[in-house]
Amino acid sequence: MFESVVQLLEEHEELQQQLGDPELHADASRSRKVNRRYAELSRIVAAHAEWTQLGDDLAAARELAEEDPAFADEIPGLEQALDAAQEKLRRLLIPRDPDDARDVIMEIKMGEGGAESALFAADLLRMYLHYAESRRWKTEVLSQTQSDLGGYKDVQVAIKGTSDDPALGVWAHLKYEGGVHRVQRVPATESQGRIHTSAAGVLVIPEVEEVEEVAIDPNDLKIDVYRSSGPGGQSVNTTDSAVRITHLPTGIVVAMQNEKSQLQNREAGMRVLRARVLAKQQEEIDAEASAVRRSQIRTMDRSERIRTYNFPENRIADHRTGYKAYNLDAVMDGALDPVVESCIQADEEARLDALGTDA
């Protein structure tokens, strides 16, 4: 069992030697890749060592129990621990999403529901910012268009992780947030106390780590400049600092007006554009992928209603995994881990079913 681990153990040793080579650290890109792979394999190495040790302990306990029945009491506990260690190792051997260690760019847009939808978009932004803070991730608001009541018609935020371990990566956790988020509550603008249903859309894409990773020909870009506007459309700048970038081959349009400098807005716009072009390329690859890939949770389906936030009942429900809890107030304050973990587990189960093997 777990014959494939032997090769991974050898690879882990090779990477460990590479990490001790000063020349590796002179190449930032290669160093990052080696560190990430080493961190990923370190989990497998530790889990395999635990599984092996428990197997040895169980064998020893059974042998001793033949001579001294007192040792028989240890056997059930060791068997249970061995089964748990085996399941842990089995899950770690599931092929990971190659983008799991990447940082992300998240866009939250108001949907059906007008002003209430924009307010909900602001609540979602706050939830994700608090969640990022709890995981010690760094956040940067790249662009925002506010509504009249203080919500957001559209807001884009970059979220950057602090670990080389793909299992702790930002994309590994937030890729499941893409889709339509529905809210049920009494809007601030509702005078009769009636519950309304509205929605906001969330798009999450992995960020491009190196400019060379996505080839964008400057001749394929149409760049327009204009004056920044605030809530209600009023101008908030006397210079043409806002930038709209159109990628002609794909039709992708990115608009930035958050910074006071046109150059800063252009740099931020290109950052988002590269990520969107990469995501589109990946979507095209996924569209041609096997049923194995398509059977997994649809992380990039922007039209899918993925979750409902019911404020009167303090209930949150994820429609993909069946997760339900009555702690919506805590979730909106950033306690999102249980929801995310339910998605990760469902994804792992789908991958295991698709593989059709016990590894």
From Swiss-Prot:
Localization of this protein: Cytoplasm
Keyword Cytoplasm in annotation: yes
GO CC term, one of those recorded: cytoplasm
Keywords assigned: Cytoplasm, Methylation, Protein biosynthesis
Species classification: Bacteria, Bacillati, Actinomycetota, Actinomycetes, Micrococcales
Pfam families cross-referenced by the UniProt entry: PCRF (PF03462), RF-1 (PF00472)
Function in brief: Peptide chain release factor 1 directs the termination of translation in response to the peptide chain termination codons UAG and UAA.
Top-level taxonomic group: Bacteria
Residue numbers carrying N5-methylglutamine: Q234
Protein name: Peptide chain release factor 1
UniProt modification remark: Methylated by PrmC. Methylation increases the termination efficiency of RF1.
InterPro entries per UniProt: PCRF (IPR005139), Pep_chain_release_fac_I (IPR000352), Pep_chain_release_fac_I_sf (IPR045853), Prokaryotic/Mito_RF (IPR050057), RF-1 (IPR004373)
Species this chain originates from: Clavibacter michiganensis subsp. michiganensis (strain NCPPB 382)
SUPFAM superfamilies given in the database record: Release factor
GO MF term set: translation release factor activity, codon specific
